[in-house]
């Protein structure tokens, strides 16, 4: 048994003990005992190469009456520890990577899940004097999203990763149409040289999927749909037809669900209308 590689875990909302209910204050450690016994501490740091990795527990469990509720924040104990850890960070570190379960920042303020982390900037203030790039790794939302954190005093990017279970194991797709997958990062020193999804279904589907069969617009004209996930406002999209660039006037951005995702969930009888990412 066991994994053939060393694994570092980050606790999430489904890792807490549901039998522990009605937690008051910011100490939810009673709901974490089983996790700690099996997998280890809920927050810690490790140095690998030129990167300082800091793993946090930003799922503050409340579980009122067994409703699985939680807040997205760091408790004071972790915040105090983070300051001490930063004080002892090796001088040759070239990048800080923060890992936690719930995203701290969202590109879409109207997204249905979750609320932004209310003390994320307080944590980042601890690292700003290091003058190092900060990368945040998160999950939870079952989508792929990249957010450049709006701070003028430091460079911070948060990557919210798709998950291996997709949209809860119904099919190997996440809510935004991204494949159910994990993400591989390659480093050279403190530089991220490549970030690539390990797509089990189609290795060519890295950031988009094309739908080009039987689709028509409101006027009845044939259209091609292109779903791009994990996009960033700095990206440049270029579409070509028979080798020729398609004029921008023929392209239109829309906010709709991925066609494949809708088909799968319709077949399962699931209502997805309430979910917004």
Where are these regions (language model features)?
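Active-site segments of SGNH/GDSL-like serine hydrolases
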Residues: 11, 94-110
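Metal-dependent phosphoesterase/phosphodiesterase active-site architecture
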Residues: 30-33, 37-39, 43, 83-86, ...
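Cofactor-binding loop segments of dinucleotide-utilizing enzymes, especially the Rossmann-like FAD-
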Residues: 12, 58, 101, 231, ...
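A generic structural motif
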Residues: 11, 138, 251-253
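Short, well-ordered beta-to-alpha junction loops that form the rim of enzyme active sites
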Residues: 58, 99-103, 140-141, 197-198
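Extended active-site neighborhood of metal-dependent phosphoesterases/phosphodiesterases
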Residues: 1-92, 111-135, 143-188, 192-196
